[in-house]
């Protein structure tokens, strides 16, 4: 069984995805964290996205282990900004698309998978067994994200979070 959860930023995709996966005994993948993981790898390698070759970017994506537990550092606003830049690069999007589809078709620990993220139901897994689209008002989503960031110790103004949510 493959379940795809799409929706707007900070709308609750992850909460729903993790809960469904746990209750149904399926593997779970937050695809937004993949872009964040690439963003973190870019930062750690001190890589310039403007000058990096397609081969270098492809190797970077191929080195990601989807079964690992990604740490809280991926949820920082800095890595979120890098993830947005990374997501705009067609080579990275294509490579991650392959990884996401492979995870869904061959989940590492069960007979099914729940994937959440942007374009999951329309682009990544158009033939998923079940598809959901989650949305909430921008101020509600900004409040959720602001609380997440503050809980991680980030000192960020609510208006900045709201602006970022509206942009995305």
Question: Which sequence ranges carry the predicted segments?
Answer:
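Short, well-ordered beta-strand core segments
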Residues: 129-133
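ATP-dependent small-molecule kinase phosphotransfer cores
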Residues: 34-112, 122-124, 139-143, 147-167
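Walker A/P-loop
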Residues: 14
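Post-Walker A helix-loop "phosphate-sensing" segment adjacent to the P-loop in P-loop NTPases
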Residues: 21-31, 47
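Hydrophobic anchor at the beta1->P-loop junction of P-loop NTPases
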Residues: 3-7
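Walker A (P-loop) phosphate-binding loop of P-loop NTPases
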Residues: 10
């Amino acid at each position: 069984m493959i379940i795809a959860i799409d929706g707007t930023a900070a709308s609750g995709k992850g909460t729903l995805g993790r809960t469904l996966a746990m209750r149904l005994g399926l593997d779970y993948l937050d695809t937004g964290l993949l872009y964040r993981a690439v963003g973190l790898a870019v930062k750690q390698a001190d890589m310039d996205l403007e000058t990096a070759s397609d081969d270098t970017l492809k190797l970077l994506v191929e080195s990601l282990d989807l079964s690992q537990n990604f740490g809280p550092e991926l949820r920082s606003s800095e890595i979120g900004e890098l993830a947005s830049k990374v997501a705009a690069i067609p080579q990275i999007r294509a490579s991650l698309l392959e990884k996401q589809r492979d995870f869904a078709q061959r989940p590492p620990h069960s007979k099914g998978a729940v994937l959440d993220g942007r374009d999951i139901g329309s682009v990544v897994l158009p033939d998923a067994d079940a598809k959901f689209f989650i949305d909430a008002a921008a101020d509600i989503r900004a409040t959720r994200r602001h609380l997440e960031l503050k809980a991680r110790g980030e000192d960020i103004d609510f208006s900045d979070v709201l602006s970022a949510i509206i942009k995305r």
